[in-house]
Amino acid sequence: QLVRRLAEALSGEPFDLVLGVARGGLIPTALLAQALGARNILTAAVMFYEGEEALPEPVFLQFPPDVLLFGKRVLVVEGVWDSRRTAFAVKARVRRAGGVPVVATLPFKPGRNRVPDRPDFYAEETAAWVVYPWALEAWPKGSYPSGCLRPTGPGKLPRALLPGPPCWRSQHGVV
Protein backbone atom coordinates (compact mmCIF):
# COMPACT_ATOMS: atom_id res chain seq x y z
CA GLN A 1 0.00 0.00 0.00
CA LEU A 2 2.84 2.40 0.78
CA VAL A 3 4.46 1.82 -2.60
CA ARG A 4 1.13 2.30 -4.34
CA ARG A 5 0.50 5.53 -2.42
CA LEU A 6 3.95 6.86 -3.25
CA ALA A 7 3.69 5.82 -6.90
CA GLU A 8 0.40 7.70 -7.21
CA ALA A 9 1.99 10.84 -5.77
CA LEU A 10 4.94 10.52 -8.17
CA SER A 11 2.96 9.54 -11.27
CA GLY A 12 2.72 13.07 -12.73
CA GLU A 13 6.39 13.86 -12.11
CA PRO A 14 8.94 13.61 -14.92
CA PHE A 15 12.12 11.74 -13.94
CA ASP A 16 15.06 10.83 -16.15
CA LEU A 17 16.27 8.08 -13.86
CA VAL A 18 15.75 6.42 -10.49
CA LEU A 19 18.58 6.14 -7.96
CA GLY A 20 18.04 3.51 -5.26
CA VAL A 21 19.95 3.89 -2.01
CA ALA A 22 21.35 0.60 -0.69
CA ARG A 23 20.43 -1.37 1.24
CA GLY A 24 17.02 -0.41 2.54
CA GLY A 25 15.96 1.52 -0.54
CA LEU A 26 16.67 -1.15 -3.15
CA ILE A 27 13.44 -3.12 -2.87
CA PRO A 28 11.26 0.02 -2.69
CA THR A 29 13.23 1.31 -5.71
CA ALA A 30 12.42 -1.81 -7.73
CA LEU A 31 8.74 -1.67 -6.75
CA LEU A 32 8.44 2.05 -7.53
CA ALA A 33 10.32 1.73 -10.82
CA GLN A 34 7.92 -1.04 -11.85
CA ALA A 35 4.87 1.02 -10.82
CA LEU A 36 6.16 4.13 -12.63
CA GLY A 37 7.39 2.29 -15.71
CA ALA A 38 10.94 3.57 -15.10
CA ARG A 39 13.73 1.73 -16.88
CA ASN A 40 16.81 3.80 -16.02
CA ILE A 41 17.66 2.53 -12.54
CA LEU A 42 20.96 3.16 -10.75
CA THR A 43 22.19 2.44 -7.22
CA ALA A 44 24.16 4.22 -4.51
CA ALA A 45 25.70 2.81 -1.35
CA VAL A 46 26.85 5.06 1.51
CA MET A 47 28.69 4.10 4.69
CA PHE A 48 28.75 6.20 7.88
CA TYR A 49 30.36 3.66 10.21
CA GLU A 50 33.40 1.45 10.15
CA GLY A 51 32.65 -1.28 12.64
CA GLU A 52 31.25 0.58 15.66
CA GLU A 53 33.09 3.84 14.91
CA ALA A 54 31.29 6.74 13.20
CA LEU A 55 33.15 8.20 10.23
CA PRO A 56 33.60 11.99 10.03
CA GLU A 57 32.32 12.05 6.44
CA PRO A 58 30.17 9.60 4.51
CA VAL A 59 32.02 7.12 2.32
CA PHE A 60 30.40 6.28 -1.01
CA LEU A 61 30.96 2.61 -1.67
CA GLN A 62 29.04 2.84 -4.93
CA PHE A 63 27.73 5.81 -6.90
CA PRO A 64 26.92 6.41 -10.57
CA PRO A 65 29.42 8.41 -12.63
CA ASP A 66 28.64 12.14 -12.79
CA VAL A 67 28.06 11.98 -16.55
CA LEU A 68 24.98 9.80 -15.98
CA LEU A 69 23.47 12.36 -13.58
CA PHE A 70 24.42 15.64 -15.25
CA GLY A 71 21.35 17.58 -16.37
CA LYS A 72 19.02 14.80 -15.21
CA ARG A 73 16.05 14.91 -12.86
CA VAL A 74 16.88 12.07 -10.46
CA LEU A 75 14.34 10.29 -8.25
CA VAL A 76 16.34 9.23 -5.16
CA VAL A 77 14.57 6.42 -3.29
CA GLU A 78 15.31 5.80 0.39
CA GLY A 79 13.84 2.94 2.42
CA VAL A 80 13.17 5.12 5.48
CA TRP A 81 13.75 8.84 6.06
CA ASP A 82 15.04 8.62 9.60
CA SER A 83 18.00 10.79 10.62
CA ARG A 84 18.31 12.10 7.06
CA ARG A 85 22.09 11.63 6.89
CA THR A 86 22.06 9.20 4.00
CA ALA A 87 19.51 11.14 1.96
CA PHE A 88 21.42 14.37 2.57
CA ALA A 89 24.71 12.83 1.39
CA VAL A 90 23.17 11.30 -1.75
CA LYS A 91 21.20 14.46 -2.57
CA ALA A 92 24.35 16.60 -2.25
CA ARG A 93 26.35 14.22 -4.44
CA VAL A 94 23.66 14.25 -7.16
CA ARG A 95 23.70 18.08 -7.08
CA ARG A 96 27.51 18.17 -7.33
CA ALA A 97 27.22 15.96 -10.41
CA GLY A 98 24.87 18.51 -12.00
CA GLY A 99 21.66 16.55 -11.43
CA VAL A 100 18.40 17.63 -9.84
CA PRO A 101 17.60 15.27 -6.94
CA VAL A 102 14.03 14.57 -5.83
CA VAL A 103 13.90 12.39 -2.70
CA ALA A 104 11.11 9.89 -2.06
CA THR A 105 10.69 7.46 0.82
CA LEU A 106 7.96 5.14 2.04
CA PRO A 107 7.85 6.27 5.70
CA PHE A 108 9.05 9.65 6.95
CA LYS A 109 10.02 9.84 10.62
CA PRO A 110 9.93 13.58 11.45
CA GLY A 111 10.75 13.03 15.12
CA ARG A 112 14.17 11.56 14.26
CA ASN A 113 15.05 14.12 11.60
CA ARG A 114 18.35 15.85 12.47
CA VAL A 115 17.82 18.87 10.19
CA PRO A 116 14.81 20.99 9.21
CA ASP A 117 14.22 19.25 5.90
CA ARG A 118 11.74 16.73 4.58
CA PRO A 119 11.65 14.28 1.71
CA ASP A 120 10.06 15.69 -1.42
CA PHE A 121 7.60 12.78 -1.44
CA TYR A 122 6.65 10.20 1.18
CA ALA A 123 3.83 7.72 1.67
CA GLU A 124 3.24 8.24 5.40
CA GLU A 125 4.60 9.76 8.60
CA THR A 126 5.42 7.51 11.52
CA ALA A 127 7.30 7.46 14.80
CA ALA A 128 7.43 3.65 14.82
CA TRP A 129 10.50 1.51 14.23
CA VAL A 130 10.17 0.28 10.66
CA VAL A 131 10.93 -3.37 9.89
CA TYR A 132 10.37 -4.52 6.34
CA PRO A 133 9.75 -8.21 5.59
CA TRP A 134 12.97 -8.34 3.56
CA ALA A 135 15.12 -7.08 6.48
CA LEU A 136 15.79 -10.53 7.93
CA GLU A 137 18.66 -9.34 10.12
CA ALA A 138 16.09 -7.35 12.13
CA TRP A 139 14.19 -10.51 13.06
CA PRO A 140 15.01 -12.34 16.31
CA LYS A 141 17.33 -15.28 15.72
CA GLY A 142 15.42 -18.43 14.82
CA SER A 143 12.14 -16.62 14.14
CA TYR A 144 12.31 -16.63 10.34
CA PRO A 145 8.98 -17.78 8.93
CA SER A 146 9.15 -20.90 6.82
CA GLY A 147 9.52 -20.09 3.14
CA CYS A 148 11.92 -17.21 3.83
CA LEU A 149 15.58 -16.97 3.03
CA ARG A 150 17.63 -16.95 6.20
CA PRO A 151 21.25 -16.08 6.90
CA THR A 152 23.51 -19.10 7.26
CA GLY A 153 25.93 -17.39 9.64
CA PRO A 154 27.24 -14.03 10.85
CA GLY A 155 28.01 -11.73 7.94
CA LYS A 156 26.88 -14.27 5.36
CA LEU A 157 24.30 -13.73 2.68
CA PRO A 158 20.95 -15.52 3.01
CA ARG A 159 21.29 -18.82 1.17
CA ALA A 160 19.13 -21.46 2.77
CA LEU A 161 15.53 -21.69 1.65
CA LEU A 162 13.22 -23.22 4.20
CA PRO A 163 10.16 -25.15 3.02
CA GLY A 164 6.72 -23.70 3.63
CA PRO A 165 4.58 -20.74 2.69
CA PRO A 166 6.07 -17.40 1.59
CA CYS A 167 7.29 -14.90 4.21
CA TRP A 168 4.72 -12.23 3.68
CA ARG A 169 1.49 -12.10 1.78
CA SER A 170 -0.45 -9.06 0.77
CA GLN A 171 -3.87 -8.86 -0.81
CA HIS A 172 -2.08 -8.74 -4.16
CA GLY A 173 0.12 -11.78 -3.70
CA VAL A 174 3.50 -12.63 -2.25
CA VAL A 175 5.91 -9.80 -1.52
Where are these regions (language model features)?
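PRPP-associated nucleotide enzymes
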Residues: 1-175
